[in-house]
Design a protein with these regions (language model features):
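Well-ordered beta-sheet/strand-loop patches within structured domains
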Residues: 18-76, 148, 165-168, 189-517
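Sec-dependent signal peptide recognition
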Residues: 2-8
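Proline-rich low-complexity regions
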Residues: 10-11, 359
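Generic structural signal for hydrophobic core residues of well-folded globular domains
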Residues: 99-102, 150-155, 185-186, 249-252, ...
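Cationic-aromatic interfacial patches
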Residues: 18-174
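Charged, long alpha-helical assembly modules
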Residues: 162, 182-184
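C-terminal motif of bacterial Sec signal peptides marking the signal peptidase cleavage site
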Residues: 13-16
Length: 517
């Protein structure tokens, strides 16, 4: 059963049950008592001003981390956590090791002062003097600040803001208490395992991390070029750039063996281009145009940077997605439904225009509604519909298309409105489109709980799915095969089979809402 939805810059998720592997570890830690240090050293200086004096290499989180450091030592009875009288705790060594391992996930140890802290601790125990305890306290606080910053980055992301439009990026609220986590950690805990549990647990996140690790070692060089005469690119076309195209496809794992001269285009080469286009989400037309070539010639560094950004976005929406979820890849314009990380259904989508982008957030599925009406958002009424009525001079422009006009919940005749009056733009006018196959939302919509009126829906504009770039909506996600999606969502609900879904769309009652079980 699908419950939760998570919209990301790259993906949208619909999730169900929690990931038990991740949840069991964190739940077990949450149930613990506060860890008692093996060799407690009580802080000599417990003033808030002193505890807040830590180095944090992140301006955005600095104030929050300072507060967390103070909170931690207060709850920990003002004792050192990482450093004991005669040696560092095993947890410190584990932390230094873990920071190195996190480079495989695109984290940079220097941001958490790995070498600096390791050196400070080593020097501290080798050169004990009258200031030893004071320096030990200070260093312990610095390690705590480093750890709390890392856990922030793991669970909330490292990029504080992308773009100026708050509609585009809406993160999850934190689901982990980083201070409580540190309070419950034992010296015997495998910190690498704990840190792993804090990261997204989806198979595609782990696959991204594995690919990122491989790309860091990839030294392949790609020489930029373009097909000399793209319009003539077809079987029989001959040019030296065709040889270069074969070579670059070979570097990507495709082996278009020439049927004749290597410089001549043949059917196998065109098929290899199509296969590559399908892999990266482009229209598989076999023509190596500018967009196809930009993907084909992407360097390992460019690929790793893109993966790093996508992994970061997944961390922003770090949720347990469970066994059943839907991933909507916005740049690829595709929706994928998974069960236990196995792809079960896929379809094309249309997403928001550049000026009305599909926002990024996590949510849950509320219900499926068949034969919906469309209550046009007031922003669209004022910005688009009224100006079009004025330009056309036809007061009934939208009435002819099945829209009814309301003001203060009372239906009114659009012919009675002076659409050219500037005051009309300030009136509380509402257009509502009746259910039909021509309704802007089509015959079914998938309603979420968010406060932005963003949902998935059918569309009468089916031809848009033939385009490679599909950014045409006002922010909602249009689905090419909504009937199949509805079936996938409702098939575990009593009596809902594909035929019943089709009947509900074509001949069922209007605004029929079904809550998935």
């Amino acid at each position: 059963m699908l419950k939760h939805i998570c919209l990301l810059s790259v993906v949208i998720f619909f999730a169900a049950c929690r990931d038990k592997g991740k949840g069991d570890l964190l739940d077990e830690m949450a149930s613990r008592e506060i860890n008692e240090p093996y060799e407690p050293i009580f802080l000599q200086d417990t003033a808030v001003a002193s505890l807040e004096k830590v180095t944090i290499k992140d301006k955005y989180y600095r104030t929050a981390i300072e507060r967390e450091v103070v909170n931690f030592y207060k709850k920990y009875n003002y004792q050192t956590r990482w450093l004991y009288q005669n040696k560092p705790s095993p947890l410190f060594a584990s932390y230094i090791k873990t920071l190195t391992e996190l480079t495989d996930y695109g984290f940079f140890p220097q941001n958490y002062r790995q070498h600096e802290l390791d050196s400070l601790v080593g020097h501290l125990y080798q050169h004990k003097d009258s200031l030893f305890l004071k320096q030990l306290e200070t260093t312990d606080r610095e390690i705590t600040a480093s750890f709390l910053l890392l856990t922030r980055h793991l669970t909330q992301g490292r990029i504080p803001k992308v773009g100026d439009d708050v509609r585009v990026w809406k993160r999850n609220k934190p689901i982990f208490d980083n201070v409580e986590l540190l309070l419950k950690l034992k010296d015997t805990d495998n910190l690498s395992t704990v840190i792993e549990a804090l990261q997204p647990q989806q198979a595609f996140y782990k696959a991204m991390a594995q690919k990122y690790k491989e790309l860091l070692k990839d030294t392949t060089s790609y020489t930029p070029f373009a097909i000399t005469d793209l319009k003539s690119f077809a079987v029989g076309y001959s040019d030296s750039t065709v040889v270069a195209l074969r070579n670059q496809l070979g570097l990507r794992g495709y082996k278009p063996v020439a049927q004749g001269a290597p410089a001549e285009v043949d059917s196998l080469l065109i098929e290899a281009v199509k296969q590559f286009q399908r892999q990266v989400g482009l229209t598989a037309d076999g023509a190596p145009g500018a967009l196809t070539m930009s993907y084909l010639q992407m360097t390992p560094k460019q690929q790793s940077d893109l993966l790093l950004l996508n992994m970061e976005r997944l961390r922003w929406q770090n949720k347990d997605l469970g066994e059943d979820y839907i991933l909507v890849n916005i740049p690829e314009y595709r929706l994928n439904l998974y069960h236990k990380d196995s792809l079960k259904f896929t379809t094309k989508i249309v997403v928001g225009k550049p000026d009305t982008p599909t926002p990024i957030f996590s949510d849950s599925l509320k219900y499926v509604e068949f034969r919906p009406t469309w209550s046009v958002p007031i922003s669209i009424v004022r910005r688009e519909m009224i100006p079009r009525i004025v330009d056309s001079g036809d007061s009934l422009k939208y009435a002819k298309r099945g829209y009814k006009l309301y003001e203060n919940n009372k239906e009114i005749d659009p012919a009675t409105i002076n659409w050219r009056d500037e005051k009309t733009l300030r009136r509380n006018l509402a257009f509502v489109e009746d259910p039909s196959e021509n309704n802007s939302l089509g015959l079914v919509k998938f309603v979420l709980h968010n406060d932005m009126s963003i949902y998935l829906h059918d569309t009468p504009s089916k031809k848009l799915f033939d385009n490679t770039q599909r950014t045409y909506s006002h922010g909602c996600v249009r689905v090419q095969y909504p009937d199949s999606l509805a079936y996938q969502l409702l098939k575990h609900t009593a009596e809902w089979n594909y035929q019943k879904v089709n009947d509900a769309m074509q001949t069922g009652r209007d605004q029929y809402r079904v809550h998935p079980k």
